[in-house]
Amino acid sequence: MKIIKRNGQEAIFDEVKITNAIIGANKEVVETERLSEEEIDNITNDIKYKCQKMKRALSVEEIQNLVEDELMKLNAFSVARKYITYRFQRALARQSNTTDDQILSLIECANEEVKQENSNKNPTVNSVQRDYMAGEVSKDLTRRILLPEDIVKAHDEGLIHFHDADYFSQHMHNCDLVNLEDMLQNGTVISETMIEKPKSFSTACNVATQIIAQVASSQYGGQSITLSHLAPFVDVSRQKFRKEVKEEFETIGLELDDEKINSLAEERLKKEITKGVQTIQYQVVTLMTTNGQAPFITVFMYLNEVPEGRLRDDLAMIIEETLKQRMKGVKNEKGVYITPAFPKLIYALQENNIEPNSQYYYLTELAARCSAKRLVPDYISEKVMKELKVDQNGNGQCYPSMGCRSFLTPYIDENGKPKYYGRFNQGVVTINLVDVACSSKRDMNKFWQIFDERLDLCYRALMCRHERLKGTPSDVAPILWQHGALARLKKGETIDKLLYGGYSTISLGYAGLYECVKYMTGKSHTDPNATPFAIEVMQHLNDACTKWKEKENIDFSLYGTPIESTTYKFAKCLQKRFGKIEDVTDKNYITNSYHIHVTEHINAFDKLTFESQFQKLSPGGAISYVEVPDMQDNIDAVLAVMKHIYNNIMYAELNTKSDYCMACGYDGEIQIEKDENGKLIWVCPNCGNKNQDMMSVARRTCGYIGTQFWNQGRTQEIKERVLHL
């Protein structure tokens, strides 16, 4: 059995330390009020038993709380007072420097919480450690100086989650849609170097990767680009190759007709497209940003984003090559092709690619094979999205998420035209719906009262995020604010005008709708008797966003939070506050956003149809998924799911497994098992390899693909997922 020390380091549970701490307090009281040795031993044994029953590693603070509880039960109030006083004195001493232990444990790779905090960061690498060290300082400043005490307390207790506190001390925003078109067509500046309009497709791809890296280093959230912004450069290369071919043959005294020139130019063009797409794939996975990780980049593939004709056909060629290269994968250090985490791919399903006889159906078939093997692309239904995202002109719009799942709301610019690329999200604060429910003790009136109190906390926390960005000069990130990624502001000009009027969004996140409904009604939100309550909860969240938007002229939007690592924190906080309630707080995770619980048996089609109604109520972002087995030999079934997505839900993905054991070469599913301490570990079923450095495991974490393993809560959630096909 293990515990988590205050610095995040994992240690063996040592009951002697509990006994010694009680003995120390016991000696400080008069003899008539002291506990006997037997009573002290009983307390220690009771605490050990309770820790074992929790089936997870408790923190030192949680164990100390148990000690206090046991002392109070025995009416040993004097001993309890001494124990609490000593604990308080030690806490004061620790507060004199709040970061040393955390940072030292990071450097020595001994911090278990950080090791599993981000499934796309390797905490043993120097560059990642530097980012985490800076993050510890930022969190310390945020907690002690920048945030009100009640918001910090609510965050610590798991009532809300104030996201990305490790970046809050700086004036940084969350995620965005990069205006690659403006930067490539009109030029940009990277590291004080003028970059003019590219003269070829491959150069455009190279410039795009440099932009991606610069943008990632200037923000903490994900970014998205669209391949349609690269498509015009295909014809730039085509015309260049036509000219080259013609000149080469004229040099040797030969004349070719246009048909032959075009044929030779197209051959060279295909190689150019392969080279350009390969540049993006390999640059993205090998670049290291100042965040200590590869850029969290999403690439959008949407045919109808460009006019019909040659430009759309050129875009189709880029999409085809992108899918082929992703299906192939990238080689790991052993030379084996594996599934890369990035870039995340999104493929738009539309009228001209969804039916077997449609013009671009061959791309949809290729996308299906790619999803079956490499977990991407994810899918946006143009049809459904245009029904949900209607702008002020009354036109439905289709555009990508910012990174994983955060969506902008429709916006019309000063020229009366829809605008999406160049917009961003200011940040996220998430409400723990499970805690709202459990705090109400099933009293419905009390539930709505507590709900509103927690929403007020979220509102004030979100305004802290907004105020942190307000007054930010464009100079803090020239690539974003001055050179076209998001705007073309002047030097010294603040970004304030971009924070209001719907240009950017700010997100109220929510988590644990399933557990909330389960506690209040005794039923899953899939039960027809419980679904109306779930919808009512969602509507209440949206109503709060509407009220705040009208008050502040800021685009508050409801967001289905992925809670990648926060799921474990919320679960631990809930168990600490309410104990283990069956099907509510008895897991080491809570359910993402509105999702059906991972253990609930339901087929893929019913799941997507049911969840679509909640996706409509998450305008700030949400994604649904279905868990599937190896589908590489059943592409027809994958295509059937994709067709269902097109007709029923805006944004969805298929989760499968893509693993490799470097110890024995096994490429099937790596299993999750418990070790002798009850900790969940990854094990190769073929050779028994347990060394995470000797295996490649790719799982959908929360929209992105994670490849650096997960905390115990998320690992349990992954282990318990049932198949939907």
Residue ranges and their predicted role:
Residues 1-110, 719-724:
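Charged, amphipathic alpha-helical regulatory modules used
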Residues 5-10, 29-36, 53, 412, ...:
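A ubiquitous short alpha-helical element
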Residues 14, 673, 701-704:
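Conformational switch/transducer regions in large eukaryotic molecular machines and scaffolds
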Residues 89-502, 523, 527-692, 696:
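Conserved catalytic cores of very large enzyme subunits
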Residues 273-277, 281, 518-519, 714-720:
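Metallocofactor- and cofactor-centric catalytic cores in central/energy metabolism, strongly enriched
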Residues 506-519, 539, 700:
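Contiguous, well-ordered alpha-helical segments that form the cores/surfaces of helical PPI scaffolds
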Residues 686-725:
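Long insertion/accessory domains within large nucleic-acid-processing enzymes
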